[in-house]
A protein has these predicted regions:
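Hydrolases whose catalytic domains are alpha/beta-hydrolase-1, hotdog thioesterase
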Residues: 117-121, 143
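Short beta-strand/loop motif that positions the catalytic acidic residue
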Residues: 154, 159-162, 166
Length: 183
């Protein structure tokens, strides 16, 4: 079976920016919005987190969602959207690196669906990053999904934030995410 064509999903969507121009920045914060939100809305965080020399980048999901179903659904159910979303984040990271910013100076952050996508991207592309900020999210897939990711985060700072009574994000998934990312 041929791989699904992901080029028409999230690729080509806008990439919003704030802060220092990428070519002049010493570091980057990639912000990933949640379902129903926009790149512009999450980029507003830059106003509350001003850091000289930091480029803030926010990719836009097609139709305001990175994938159609809950992050707890089987991975196949969210395809090909999930693969496209992960590829889009990878494109943004590559763009930042091409501007001369080392991975250790790149922080990925997200809220809700964006937090899930940021955590999944970092887990699948493990290396030393500047950090991971995941608010109200966790690794993608149902309970029992193999988490045999290769690589190591090598001391990447990770902040996972979530209510212990969130109706959409089980505390156990946040704890599992923390354990996987700590390996």
């Amino acid at each position: 079976m041929a791989a699904p064509d992901i080029s028409s999903l999230h690729q080509g969507q806008p990439l919003r920016a704030a802060g220092s121009p990428l070519a002049e920045a010493a570091g980057a914060l990639i912000l990933i919005h949640g379902r129903g939100a926009t790149a512009e809305s999450i980029l507003e965080l830059a106003d509350f987190l001003p850091q000289p020399g930091l480029a803030y980048l926010a990719p836009q999901a097609a139709n305001y969602a990175w994938y159609p179903y809950s992050f707890l659904e089987p991975l196949e159910r969210n395809e090909p959207y999930l693969s496209s979303a992960l590829a889009r984040v990878g494109e943004v990271v590559a763009r930042v690196e091409a501007a001369g910013i080392a991975p250790e100076r790149i922080v990925l952050g997200g809220f809700s669906q964006g937090a899930c996508l940021a955590a999944e991207f970092v887990a699948r592309n493990a290396r030393r990053y500047g950090g991971l900020l995941a608010f109200s999210g966790g690794l993608i897939g149902p309970s029992g999904t193999p988490r045999d990711y290769t690589g190591a985060l090598d001391g990447t700072p990770v902040l996972l934030g979530c209510s212990d009574v969130d109706p959409h994000i089980p505390l156990a998934r946040v704890e599992e995410t923390a354990a996987v990312l700590a390996r």
